[in-house]
Amino acid sequence: MIIRSPKPEVKIVVERDPVKTSFEKWAKPGHFSKTLAKGPDTTTWIWNLHADAHDFDSHTKDLEEISRKVFSAHFGQLAIIFIWLSGMYFHGARFSNYEAWLADPTHIKPSAQVVWPIVGQEILNGDVGGGFRGIQITSGFFQLWRASGITSELQLYCTAIGALIFAALMLFAGWFHYHKAAPELAWFQDVESMLNHHLAGLLGLGSLSWAGHQIHVSLPINQLLDAGVDPKEIPLPHEFILNRDLLAQLYPSFAKGLTPFFTLNWSEYSDFLTFRGGLNPVTGGLWLTDTAHHHLAIAVLFLIAGHMYKTNWRIGHNLKDILEAHKGPFTGEGHKGLYEILTTSWHAQLAINLAMLGSLTIIVAHHMYSMPPYPYLAIDYGTQLSLFTHHMWIGGFIIVGAAAHAAIFMVRDYDPTTQYNNLLDRVLRHRDAIVSHLNWVCIFLGFHSFGLYIHNDTMSALGRPQDMFSDTAIQLQPIFAQWIQNTHASAPGSTAPGATASTSLTWGGGDLVTVGSKVALLPIPLGTADFLVHHIHAFTIHVTVLILLKGVLFARSSRLIPDKANLGFRFPCDGPGRGGTCQVSAWDHVFLGLFWMYNAISVVIFHFSWKMQSDVWGSISDQGVVTHITGGNFAQSSITINGWLRDFLWAQASQVIQSYGSSLSAYGLLFLGAHFVWAFSLMFLFSGRGYWQELIESIVWAHNKLKVAPAIQPRALSIVQGRAVGVAHYLLGGIVTTWAFFLARIIAVG
């Protein structure tokens, strides 16, 4: 790989007109590879084309050129995101009942899709209330729009148009920064400038501008909506921004302007920057004054953080110095050499970022229900379930991606000669201890967690309920989790001044919030059933980590294949004539890791779905009696495998199975079709390549007989291609099956 040394002084360095814009070249399939550009001889060509189109490492060894391609591709990605967002806002403007929902969010369900009657599928347009017929949506956009202060469909139109303009700008920027003014390598490697700009600009000013919007637009509009003012009567956003008196009527401290700020009398602003905790009883969402305060505080932190790193002014941190000074008593050279890795290997950089982003996505999933950020989100059970499930799946995929890119770094970018006795080298040298210990943990967790269930199933089958692990027999209470819950529940009053409730109602205490006779949130009790399933979570997560980590640590070499690095990231076996060396590539570990990730996330979303229906979601009577959707059956039913099958999977599948002839019938078809896609994957996963090659040759013979033989020779999928197609269909089929099962159920009963 060609690497140029960075210049000491930070300058904005670009190369003018480095690559000619050529539609002729662009239109030629495989132009990035000499072999592929020749065109297809066999059907393998189309697979290789897809596999390598975005593998910029394989196009060139010049790190600068690779960096420019990645940078340009990011603008393309942003353009796609803006187009997608524009579509969402356009649907809200053109096909939705947003204004009706805004006027009565407790009785009207959100819908932003109306099916056209072509072959009778207008049956899918269910009655969502207020005389509107359409498909009920569960994306949470309506709640987000209300929190943003959007009060009309015209505003959604304008935002949709704005997003398209931004998409066009992004497409232009992607072209411009590759073809017209491409940054030099030194610019991509200038980490201090990058940190300063990303922290202060992206996160600092980004949070500050959102806080400004919340304070000047969202808060006053939501205050009036909560008070029952008709959305059409509420002043438009620009009126609040331009007319301070309007704001001062709602938040008196606005009349004082910036005087309290400069006189350090900040508590004057506590009418719109609060620290209450808990939920707004009108909307069942977080107090928007709390979230405005939060974004302002985050902005201050990141604006400070964005001034910490040394650039042209001789003050501030230097990342290389920080890393090289980081030595512990047992870590040898510590982080020495990591700076060079992270400035020359974008795979290493990406692996760390994906690991953190994936974890953060899963944290988001857990906060969306425990601290619902938007008005009326908490009583829209379909949206709650969808947001949790979506963020869990996405987080799982991103974490597997982290392992994939870590392994690619090991194979393609790692240079053992420059890494001696630093942390990475030391981890690699005791990888056998790491993997064997992790394997022991997996076996322990697997046998013990599953064993508890098997014990319960056996006792239940023998009619001995008194000998089961349950809240009413042999208790296994999650005492540590309960201790954490109690600590948080009793925290308000002794922690932040003015906090009247804990961060989340789920911690405990006597509070419950109901909106429109539906439960928004209440304290979530944890018992033996949760203790059991949490150990299944521990087991599946540890196995996923074992597979992925083994793939990374043994990506370059192993006792079985000492020269594995020479074989590349993905290979089927170590050549012919060496048995028992198949499925050992780093790619194969990612492949296997995906199945265990799927296992792990499935158990999590099943646990969440049943627990919430059993112990949280439900309705409240005029006398204050709460009736949960499944009547609190989680604690006693989920402690056996049979209970999971009978009272969760089978009992709750009745809605999707019986959906034909109703507005939910699309979910019934998806449920059926996705089962088929899942089963189809097994044909690829349990296949032998030779079997298909023989079959193909018979079929080609028949075509030759009829003189209709193709010019491009058909070939069976390679082993790796077959596994890739298999895992893709396995995951797609499994996830869509779950999606249809969850939504048909929760829309029918929620």
UniProtKB/Swiss-Prot annotation:
GO terms under cellular component: chloroplast thylakoid membrane; photosystem I
One GO process term, biological-process aspect: photosynthesis
Gene3D superfamilies in the record: Photosystem I PsaA/PsaB (1.20.1130.10)
Binding of chlorophyll a', residues: H675
Record: residues binding phylloquinone: W692
Family: Belongs to the PsaA/PsaB family.
Quaternary structure, from the entry: The PsaA/B heterodimer binds the P700 chlorophyll special pair and subsequent electron acceptors. PSI consists of a core antenna complex that captures photons, and an electron transfer chain that converts photonic excitation into a charge separation. The eukaryotic PSI reaction center is composed of at least 11 subunits.
Name the record gives this protein: Photosystem I P700 chlorophyll a apoprotein A1
Gene: psaA
